[in-house]
């Protein structure tokens, strides 16, 4: 699953309301990795890495932020596996165009869980308002032609499940350990997956996005933790 908000943070947000302030979410905490949790967005790379590593610190088990190589291996393992409710077989073309199995702005997928709508603020190109997550329901996400979208709780859509992995395509962009550099040599970190405010024609699960500075936060960016058995 994508990393879900820590219990302590979820409990302090009245009715799961999201104001768009990264101060609510951009902090330390132990992520939840299970279905039905509000995904941890508005978090920068530094906190995402530290929080992913905080899940398990034992002699025989540890955790961390997913690497770019691990992401690529995960996608390769998915080829030939069944795509959730669609019952079709995932091919390499599904990695280039993830429309059929990811939660993106310009498609509709079936879900059983909670959903929050994100509305673009036309007066400020950097502002989106994320409305409250409702109660658990069944339905399909909306197909938008502009920068609006429906964000789902973790594991809400079986359509978005391949090889027992949820939301590798869409829902939230996910920080990785992979490094990139901008034209001035400043260190960035790569994001993968595409998100609920992304267009599937441009931002599929195999797409590498430069991400941004390690202190960048956004309504469409979260992370995923991986486990290491020693």
Predicted regions and their residues:
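Active-site-proximal beta-strands of protease catalytic cores
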Residues: 170-178
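Disulfide-stabilized, aromatic/cysteine-rich ligand-recognition loop
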Residues: 39-46, 50, 62, 66, ...
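Short aromatic-cysteine micro-motif
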Residues: 1-168
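Residue-level signal for functionally critical sites in structured catalytic/ligand-binding pockets
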Residues: 1-4, 68, 174, 220-224
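Acidic glycine-/aspartate-rich tracts in secreted/extracellular proteins
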Residues: 3-6, 70, 79, 177-182, ...
């Amino acid at each position: 699953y994508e990393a879900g908000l820590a219990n302590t943070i979820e409990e302090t947000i009245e009715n799961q309301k999201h104001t768009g302030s990264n101060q609510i979410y951009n902090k330390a905490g132990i992520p939840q990795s299970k279905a039905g949790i509000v995904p941890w967005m508005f978090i920068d790379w530094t906190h995402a890495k530290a929080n992913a590593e905080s899940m398990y610190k034992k002699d025989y088990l540890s955790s961390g932020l997913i690497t770019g190589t691990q992401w690529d291996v995960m996608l390769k393992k998915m080829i030939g596996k069944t795509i959730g409710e669609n019952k079709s077989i995932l091919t390499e073309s599904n990695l280039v165009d993830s429309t059929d199995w990811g939660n993106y702005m310009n498609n509709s997928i079936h879900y059983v869980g909670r959903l929050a709508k994100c509305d673009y603020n036309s007066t400020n190109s950097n502002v989106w308002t994320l409305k409250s997550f409702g109660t658990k329901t069944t339905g399909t996400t909306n197909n938008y032609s502009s920068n609006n979208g429906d964000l789902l709780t973790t594991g809400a859509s079986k359509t978005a499940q391949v090889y027992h992995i949820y939301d590798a395509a869409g829902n939230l962009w996910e920080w990785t350990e992979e490094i990139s550099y901008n034209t001035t040599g400043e260190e960035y970190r790569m994001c993968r997956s595409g998100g609920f405010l992304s267009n599937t024609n441009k931002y599929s699960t195999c797409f590498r996005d430069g991400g941004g500075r390690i202190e960048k936060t956004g309504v469409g960016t979260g992370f995923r933790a991986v486990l290491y058995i020693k």
